Amino acid sequence: KYDMLHVPVRQNNENTATVRQRMQAGCRILCIQFTNSDAFAAGVVLDGTGQEIAVKFWKGGKEYSHHCRKLLEKIKKSQEATGGRQTGRVDQKYWMHLKHLSEHYGHQVTSQILRFAVEQNVSVIVLPRYNQEYSRNVMKGSGNWGPLHLSTRIGQYLDYKAWKNGIIVIEVHATGISKI
């Protein structure tokens, strides 16, 4: 049995400017797009005028997919060995390993993104937000254990980790962005 204790911690932050105030001040922005390839995410840093300053790709998607595929093969092999007559929590260790693997990669990529944001003196991180139906179809098409599936976990981790560094994370609807 796994019990997790979450204790809320109060932490003061000196930079409490809103996104609008930061944009008017000409702060740098990191825009991130998640992928389903070897790169978990691609990011570009823009200055206040919209000029590109730096570009970065965070890799490891193939490695993550490979580890997940190996664990799923072990689960399938275990189920075939018992002829589908499994009772209880037979493959729990494999499922927990998959869960911990996704948490590990989520934290790892989040830390890399945040390190890059701090190096580039970024004030706002922008993540894409899609409508629910589109997200559901894309996630279903990418598979449960593909790199794209980690985008929600990475977004959640980025939210609280960036706040500690005085960076605001926002989600912007991605409709029509490709037309610009």
Could you tell me what each predicted segment is?
Residues D3-I180:
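Positively charged, helix-rich recognition surfaces that bind polyanionic ligands
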